[in-house]
């Protein structure tokens, strides 16, 4: 049986997974999830510089923004599943995904970069 490390066991499991297409409920942009963190991992200066400060103790996501070269880092409370069935257009999509099936992206075989490398 796989056990989470004690320090992670108290965190909420992310509702979205890599490949899910989401919509930001506040700013209304669409994007695709590429990764998640159990809690906000951004530094305090970045967090305080945002227009809003959602709870840090919830999942946060790395999102490729549709029709943009941008990557955002929203909290789970800022996102909802996008059920339009429409694809996301982003220059980095091929770095993470190989296909789009049934409204979500399929992970490719390219190894993802290690954090802090």
What are the functions of these language-model segments?
Residues 25, 34, 66:
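Structured beta-strand/turn binding interfaces of compact recognition modules in eukaryotic regulators
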Residues 40-49:
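Short, solvent-exposed secondary-structure boundary/capping segments
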Residues 52:
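Phosphate-recognition beta-domain surfaces
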Residues 11, 27-29, 47, 61, ...:
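Sequence-level detector for tyrosine residue identity
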């Amino acid at each position: 049986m796989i056990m989470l490390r004690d320090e992670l066991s108290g965190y909420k499991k992310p509702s979205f997974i890599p490949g899910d297409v989401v919509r930001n409920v506040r700013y209304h942009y669409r994007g695709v999830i590429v990764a998640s963190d159990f809690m906000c991992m951004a530094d305090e200066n970045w967090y305080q510089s945002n227009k809003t400060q959602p709870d840090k103790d919830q999942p946060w996501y790395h999102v490729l923004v549709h029709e943009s070269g941008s990557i955002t880092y929203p909290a789970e409370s800022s996102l909802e599943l996008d059920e339009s069935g429409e694809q996301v257009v982003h220059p980095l999509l091929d770095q993470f995904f190989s296909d789009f099936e049934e409204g979500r992206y399929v992970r490719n075989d390219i190894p993802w970069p290690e954090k802090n490398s």
